[in-house]
């Protein structure tokens, strides 16, 4: 076969793809009493700690990093459990948000405000007295972690993982 007879292979685009999704970790932090840690955003909504997963970072590393950056609590990535993946398009019809729901039960420190422009205060909250309004992605993460919670969480796709952390007081 001569070079002219060889089939041509189209050149692949070597440019990075246009982002079609954002990926983050939501962190459900529980204390010995089974309460969850929530922060009051300046807009008046309550939210879990969390944020984006940086390039090259594992979900567990991102959750531990976001936890210390936002709350000053220190958790070992080995103590972070990934319990579910959520997909929604709440922030943009053109961009899918993917959130890894993580649970942290072992940590050191006392929560304090590390980013006052993002959180006014942190509070340990009993599950039967969750404050309102909850930031919708935080409500989704809490509902994925504990489906019994009576939360309005909006439309999203929920992919639970087989081995998942159980909410406090739910047995084995």
Regions found by a protein language model. Give the residues of each.
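A generic fold-level signal
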Residues: 20-22, 31, 94-97, 117, ...
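Structural detector for helix-capping/boundary residues
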Residues: 25, 51, 65, 78, ...
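Conserved Nudix-box catalytic region and its N-terminal flanking loop in Nudix hydrolases
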Residues: 31-69, 74
């Amino acid at each position: 076969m001569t070079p002219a007879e060889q089939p041509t292979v189209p050149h692949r685009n070597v440019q990075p793809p246009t982002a079609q999704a954002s990926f983050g970790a939501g962190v459900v932090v529980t204390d010995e009493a089974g309460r969850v840690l929530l922060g009051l955003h300046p807009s008046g909504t309550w939210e879990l700690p969390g944020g984006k997963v940086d390039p090259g970072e594992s979900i567990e590393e991102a959750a531990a990093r976001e936890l210390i950056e936002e709350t000053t609590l220190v958790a070992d990535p080995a103590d972070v459990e990934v319990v579910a993946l959520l997909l929604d398009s709440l922030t943009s019809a053109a961009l899918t948000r993917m959130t890894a729901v993580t649970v942290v039960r072992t940590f050191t420190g006392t929560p304090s405000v590390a980013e006052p422009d993002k959180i006014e205060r942190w509070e340990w909250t009993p599950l039967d007295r969750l404050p309102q309004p909850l930031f919708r992605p935080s409500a989704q993460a809490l509902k994925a972690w504990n489906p019994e919670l009576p939360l309005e969480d909006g439309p999203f796709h929920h992919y639970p993982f087989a081995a998942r952390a159980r909410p406090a007081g739910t047995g084995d």
